[in-house]
Amino acid sequence: MSKEKFERTKPHVNVGTIGHVDHGKTTLTAAITTVLAKTYGGSARAFDQIDNAPEEKARGITINTSHVEYDTPARHYAHVDCPGHADYVKNMITGAAQMDGAILVVAATDGPMPQTREHILLGRQVGVPYIIVFMNKCDMVDDEELLELVEMEVRELLSAYDFPGDDLPVVRGSALKALEGEAEWEAKIIELAGYLDSYIPEPERAIDKPFLLPIEDVFSISGRGTVVTGRVERGIVKVGEEVEIVGIKDTVKSTCTGVEMFRKLLDEGRAGENVGVLLRGIKREDIERGQVLAKPGSIKPHTTFESEVYILSKDEGGRHTPFFKGYRPQFYFRTTDVTGTIELPEGVEMVMPGDNINMIVTLIHPIAMDDGLRFAIREGGRTVGAGVVAKVIA
């Protein structure tokens, strides 16, 4: 069928609904699929289909997440919605569902609530780049001034967390009325979809980013030199290009003298491919798993960073007891564990299994990192937490 082929050429954008419990995130998700299917074609998803979210595992953590898809004339969207607050926290920290932008749902009847604030903060910490506000349940508020007040409050809250609160789009609607087919409220869903298209820029594809390959294995091939293997995380490496080996030890430059995949020689290795890269003038013992191969100057090694972390509950196979300052677990980045120490926020004495917490980590070896890098926290090979680098410090 020709339609299927056409769909694949559209830009693909990942979004999700965030916000306080019972403010209508799942109802809005259902309304978007329903109204867009009716307007532009595609399939609608009912509330109970979305609310009954399947379990997934990401970095050893079980998360309930619903994925729906919908189309505007310009784009194809993959949209994630979580049933419970804990699922949002886990989802955002593990990066199980990366969001190019989020729809913050705030009930006009309540205004911003504690989880509204927490989701905005998490969005800031884990690097959700754009937020669009959907003020829900506006059919239940007759007072125009009250709506103005709620909108102002939400904008101020977003500004407080470094989002452009004064400039970002706010749509006033009613997900339930739109779902029930009332035309004036359906129009608000179309307005929201228009903002998804115009306000969230098309994400940069992995292949267009600077080259990076996390090293999984190192071999010595007599007469040819040293080969490192791994899956190209982003970008392209071409034969003859200069690369840097970053992390754990001092950064070293080399040249890629060959790329191979399944024993065949290639001119280049691209994002998503498992390749072997032959390096000039590098000894087998100069390089190890856990380092990365990268475009020169594109990534630096760091030891200290601020992080947002979720600690597994006992039921999830995590610790049975809290930990305190001075805790020294392993931090698993990409392909290797590095021991690190932690610094808890002022006034926090201990962290319980099932908590999420902001903490400063200092590693004993530097690791190639940027803000937004995900990691696992492990004790003797067992995952006890997941985290994200919120801000590199040193």
UniProtKB/Swiss-Prot annotation:
Which cellular component terms (GO) are annotated to the entry? cytoplasm
This enzyme's EC code(s): 3.6.5.3
Q: Which SUPFAM superfamilies match?
A: EF-Tu/eEF-1alpha/eIF2-gamma C-terminal domain, P-loop containing nucleoside triphosphate hydrolases, Translation proteins
Chain positions covered by the region annotation G2:
60-64
Which biological process terms from the Gene Ontology are attached to this UniProt entry? translational elongation
Q: Ranges for the tr-type G domain? A: 10-204
Which catalysed reactions does the entry list for this protein?
A: GTP + H2O = GDP + phosphate + H(+)
Entry binding sites for GTP: 19-26, 81-85, 136-139
Location of this chain's protein in the cell: Cytoplasm
Q: Give me the residues that bind Mg(2+), please.
A: T26
> Where is this protein primarily located?
cytoplasm
Q: Name one Pfam family in it.
A: GTP_EFTU_D3
The protein's UniProt keywords, in alphabetical order, are: Cytoplasm, Elongation factor, GTP-binding, Hydrolase, Magnesium, Metal-binding, Nucleotide-binding, Protein biosynthesis
Region annotation (G3) maps to 81-84
Q: Which residues form a coiled coil?
A: none
**What Gene3D superfamilies does the database record attribute to this sequence?**
P-loop containing nucleotide triphosphate hydrolases, Translation factors
Molecular function GO labels: GTP binding; GTPase activity; guanosine tetraphosphate binding; translation elongation factor activity
The UniProt entry, under CDD domains, shows: EF_Tu, EFTU_II, EFTU_III
Which residues lie within the region annotated G4? 136-139
Q: Per the record, which residues fall in region G1?
A: 19-26
Q: Which family does it belong to?
A: Belongs to the TRAFAC class translation factor GTPase superfamily. Classic translation factor GTPase family. EF-Tu/EF-1A subfamily.
Q: What does this protein do?
A: GTP hydrolase that promotes the GTP-dependent binding of aminoacyl-tRNA to the A-site of ribosomes during protein biosynthesis.
Q: Which HAMAP family does the record associate with it?
A: EF_Tu_B
Assembly and binders: Monomer.
Identify this protein by name. Answer: Elongation factor Tu-A
Species this protein is from:
Yersinia pestis
